[in-house]
Amino acid sequence: MQRLSLPAPAKLNRMLHIVGRRADGYHELQTLFQFLDRSDTLHFSPRADGAIHLAPAIADVDHDANLIVRAARLLQHASGTHQGVDIHLDKRLPMGGGLGGGSSDAATTLLALDRLWSLDLGLPRLAELGLTLGADVPVFVRGHSAWAEGIGERLTPVTLDTPWFVVIHPGEEIATPAVFGHPELTRDTPPISMARALRGGAEQGRAWRNDCEAVVRRLSPDVAHALDWLSAFGPAMLTGTGSCLFCPLTSERQADRILRRVGSHWHAFKARGCNTSPLHDALGIHDEWSPMSQYGDA
């Protein structure tokens, strides 16, 4: 195989509750992950000398610290292969926006090189490796909408509705440590069952919420303003720790109408929700997971 070009899709946190804090400082979460049909694109070309090269350079990110390079080297080490790769990144997803771009790029790298280098490690092992790179990487490896607990690594596949979304990036990054380290962050939301979470989004509208929103509003008046503006069209929310915001909509036409009204000072796009990752679709992967229905069991 000479070359692979694959998507690294965005994700949304359709809801995000912080239910505790561990002794090691990590936060215990409950969240619903869903993919979007908007992606970065990575191009992989094998090399025989074992070198890992990534281009173009990303401002303020050291080459060797980039999650893409780290994922490639992790896979080399775990498999014992001496193969290398040239990687070209076409970046479309904003950095620091809560869309999971870096984690998704890392997951795409793991799956691409598993295929390109003929390693056949399997999704469970690749997800295990991905977790050492970041808590969001496993859901991108497994490739299905999921209910997540723990620090985000305990995953149960689910089937969600797949509306159109308008996503707004107000133009700034929100540092995750600034949010999770904020003294006013809610850290004691009572845990709920997965089935209740799934029913809540369908039956109660605004029942899906993001516990990070209040802190992000304090940290960024621009995000607060954009969120208030988008909320006029539906149940707008923050994804992850921000700064991207999203609003589920009933039709692409409605999304187009909203996009025409977005000010030029905000970057915005429309995307469709997906239950199966565009990466898995591109690779023809059919995971062994058996998702629950949209509303779950009682």
From Swiss-Prot:
Active site per the UniProt annotation: 11, 136
Keywords, in A-Z order: ATP-binding, Isoprene biosynthesis, Kinase, Nucleotide-binding, Transferase
Enzyme Commission number(s): 2.7.1.148
Pathway info: Isoprenoid biosynthesis; isopentenyl diphosphate biosynthesis via DXP pathway; isopentenyl diphosphate from 1-deoxy-D-xylulose 5-phosphate: step 3/6
GO molecular function: 4-(cytidine 5'-diphospho)-2-C-methyl-D-erythritol kinase activity; ATP binding
Residue positions binding ATP: 94-104
Protein function: Catalyzes the phosphorylation of the position 2 hydroxy group of 4-diphosphocytidyl-2C-methyl-D-erythritol.
BP GO terms, sorted: isopentenyl diphosphate biosynthetic process, methylerythritol 4-phosphate pathway; terpenoid biosynthetic process
Signal peptide limits: none
Pfam families: GHMP_kinases_C (PF08544), GHMP_kinases_N (PF00288)
InterPro entries recorded: GHMP_kinase_C_dom, GHMP_kinase_C_sf, GHMP_kinase_N_dom, IspE, Ribosomal_Su5_D2-typ_SF, Ribsml_uS5_D2-typ_fold_subgr
Superkingdom: Bacteria
Name the UniProt record assigns to this protein: 4-diphosphocytidyl-2-C-methyl-D-erythritol kinase
Family membership noted in the UniProt record: Belongs to the GHMP kinase family. IspE subfamily.
Catalytic activity: 4-CDP-2-C-methyl-D-erythritol + ATP = 4-CDP-2-C-methyl-D-erythritol 2-phosphate + ADP + H(+)
